[in-house]
Amino acid sequence: MSRIGKLPVTLPEKVELSVSPSNLVTVKGPKGTLTQQVDVDIKVSVEDGKVVVARPTEQKRHKALHGLYRSLISNMVQGVSQGYKVELELVGVGYKATATNNILELSLGYSHGIFLKLPSEISASALTEKGKNPIVTLECIDKQLIGQVSAKIRSLRKIEPYKGKGVRFKGEVVRRKAGKTASK
C-alpha cells in the first residue's frame, strides 16, 4: 500500500466531490471548481465525508499513480476550500513591482521593464513600503498553476549568491558565498 495513497482525504463542509463514469474528478467549493482526469485503473470513491483512492494491483505503475492522484485530489480540496497564497520578495536596489488587472509590471535592474500577463485564475497584488523590499502576492485555487507562475517570476532574476539580490520566496534562506579576498 502506498503510504500517501492509503490515507483518505477529508472533505470539509461546503466542499463537494463528484466522479464521472469517465473518471473525471470534479471538486466544488466556496472558492471555485477544479477538475482532474484520473487514470482508468485508479478508483476514486466518497465514503462518509472522506475521499478514498484505491488501486487494482501492486504493480509499480499502480503504486505510483495511487499516491499521485491522492495528492492531486488533496491539493484540489484544499484549493477550493482555503486557496493558495505565494509571496515573492524583490531584493535589490531599484527593484519595483506593480499589479494592474492581470498584468504584473516588474523593474528588476534590467534596461527595460518586464510585463508579465498572468492567467485569469491568479490574482496578484504588489506591496511597496518605503525602506522595505517590494512584495508580490499571488493567490489562486490551483496549486500547480500558482507554483508554475511563481517559479517563472522567480526565474526572471535568479538570486545572486554574493549579494543576495534577486527574486525570492518570502522567508527563503539564501546561501551566501564569500567574495574574493584581496592579496597583498
UniProtKB/Swiss-Prot annotation:
Stated name of the protein: Large ribosomal subunit protein uL6
Role this protein plays: This protein binds to the 23S rRNA, and is important in its secondary structure. It is located near the subunit interface in the base of the L7/L12 stalk, and near the tRNA binding site of the peptidyltransferase center.
Subunit structure: Part of the 50S ribosomal subunit.
Domain of life: Bacteria
One of the GO biological process terms: cytoplasmic translation
Cellular component, GO annotation: cytosolic large ribosomal subunit
InterPro entries in UniProt: Ribosomal_uL6-like, Ribosomal_uL6-like_a/b-dom_sf, Ribosomal_uL6_a/b-dom, Ribosomal_uL6_bac-type
One term of GO molecular function: structural constituent of ribosome
Record PANTHER family: 60S/50S RIBOSOMAL PROTEIN L6/L9, LARGE RIBOSOMAL SUBUNIT PROTEIN UL6M
Keyword rRNA-binding in annotation: yes
Stated family: Belongs to the universal ribosomal protein uL6 family.
Cross-referenced Pfam families: Ribosomal_L6 (PF00347)
Keywords from the UniProt entry: Ribonucleoprotein, Ribosomal protein, RNA-binding, rRNA-binding
